[in-house]
Amino acid sequence: MMQDDRAREWFETNRANWDERVPIHVTGRFYDQPGFLAGRDTLQPFERDEVGDVAGKTLVHLQCHFGQDTLSWARSGARVTGLDFSAPAIEAARAAAAQIGVDADFVVSNVYDAAEALGERQFDIVYVGIGSLIWLPDVEAWAKVVARLLRPGGFLYLSDGHPMAQILADESLTVEHSYFATEPTRWEEPGTYADLDAVTTHNVTYEWPHALSEVFSAILAAGLRIDCFAERDYALYPRWPFLDRRDDGTWRMPSDMPSVPLMYSLRASKPA
């Protein structure tokens, strides 16, 4: 896949965007890095419930950004490795691990090259967090990488934005994008979701929509078994301006509007 010239160009464009935004995210209010360093947990309760006890288990976090979720798993006793294609993000993750005194391994690599970058190591858990798959053009190749990274009996845990929510317009519940699109959507937007007013220069990104059927088929074709699947009617950020913020920090539709799935999660195991 990465031998395709277009894919390589898209990845490099996305990498430049993420590289530029790392210091904005590390120092901004959205991620609250001081609070995290002081002990704040960044994982969602449903993630902890569905993953279960990680004490003593090996866990690799793909597309880990600057490592908050990775290190949250480490604080729970997992032996963690974080991987991301952004060198500045990995530098920030390593600095955070050193600052809080947590043993963690962070590696710079494209996710498609993860097995080689990690020396063909295998893990008990492959964790993929919210907002990951839209950055990948080929989920079938991604699922094969996941399967290579899992030891027999290990499992993938994926938590992500629901593709249904991704096809809707930014200001309404009107369908604006194709659910079954095969080409990436090109965006050109200054700032970042963490700070809309931030001054940035690398503002172009490419995102790929992936239908649930595409994700499920890729995971099954890689030889994994889907053990559980859940959909959620809330988001972790104001996806639309009319969403209501609840006391638990989630964002939900007003009571007079129909609900739509905004997130999903699944767990898929590799046969022992």
Explain the meaning of each model-derived region:
Residues 140-155:
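A short glycine-rich, Lys/Arg-flanked "PGG" loop and its adjoining helix->strand segment in the class I
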